[in-house]
Curated annotation (Swiss-Prot):
One of its GO terms (biological process) is positive regulation of long-day photoperiodism, flowering. It comes from Arabidopsis thaliana (Mouse-ear cress). It is found in: Nucleus. Residues 3-57 form the MADS-box domain. This is Agamous-like MADS-box protein AGL17. Preferentially expressed in roots. GO terms for cellular component: nucleus. InterPro entries: MADS-box/MEF2_TF, MEF2-like_N, TF_Kbox, TF_MADSbox, TF_MADSbox_sf. The gene is AGL17. Pfam families: K-box, SRF-TF. Keywords: DNA-binding, Nucleus, Transcription, Transcription regulation. Probable transcription factor. One of its GO terms (molecular function) is DNA-binding transcription factor activity. It comes from the Eukaryota.
């Protein structure tokens, strides 16, 4: 049979109460540790026994977690109060104005517009910042040039490959024409012919074939005229 439901109420027997407190306290601290590790949560646990003995656990530190808790509660209360909310956004606006002023002043110093009153150390810091910026610009420029060179090399190799492929096709077509010429006129006619002479012979043979094919039409035309 299953265990009966335990009634949650104060344990009267002091010995049983102490044993239960010890077991439940250890289990609670174990669960707090697991929650902090598994969920990357900031956990703080504070326990006082009925004898005023302190037990605590914190994933970071009890003090920092309590300070964070107090700050969060204070901000929450301020946001719930309209007047406090206005003050909050006023502080935010003032902070942003100060940051903007600092950025503008830094920009003027980096561009050399506002250098009066700066010490030697401050000028050296500005010089170091400019040198770092120049190094970054040079590195970016070199990277862009390297990428462009790689792309041009890739295109050159592609064109070279296409030229080789076209050259192979031309040679293959020439060989086919030579084979056709040999079949049509025999191998004896090709002996002793150079490359250009053989090409001329192939094209000349093609012209003769076209001429021979057109002669019957001319003969028929002449016969019709005589009749």
């Amino acid at each position: 049979m299953g265990r009966g439901k335990i009634v949650i109420q104060k344990i009267d027997d002091s010995t049983s109460r102490q044993v239960t407190f010890s077991k439940r306290r250890k289990g609670l601290i174990k669960k707090a540790k697991e929650l902090a590790i598994l969920c990357d949560a900031e956990v703080c646990l504070i326990i006082f026994s009925n004898t005023d003995k302190l037990y605590d656990f914190a994933s970071s530190s009890v003090k920092s977690t309590i300070e964070r808790f107090n700050t969060a509660k204070m901000e929450e209360q301020e946001l719930m109060n309209p007047a406090s909310e206005v003050k909050f956004w006023q502080r935010e606006a003032e902070t942003l104005r100060q940051e903007l002023h600092s950025l503008q002043e830094n920009y003027r110093q980096l561009t050399g517009v506002e250098l009066n009153g700066l010490s030697v150390k401050e000028l050296q810091n500005i010089e170091s910042q400019l040198e770092m910026s120049l190094r970054g610009i040079r590195m970016k420029r070199e990277q862009i040039l390297t990428n462009e060179i790689k792309e041009l090399t890739r295109k050159r190799n592609l064109v070279h490959h296409e030229n080789l492929e076209l050259s192979r096709k031309v040679q293959r077509i020439h060989q086919e024409n030579v084979e056709l010429y040999k079949k049509a006129y025999g191998t004896s006619n090709t002996n002793g012919l150079g490359h250009h002479e053989l090409v001329d012979a192939v094209y000349e043979s093609h012209a003769q074939v076209r001429l021979q094919l057109s002669q019957p039409e001319q003969s028929h035309y002449k016969t019709s005229s005589n009749s």
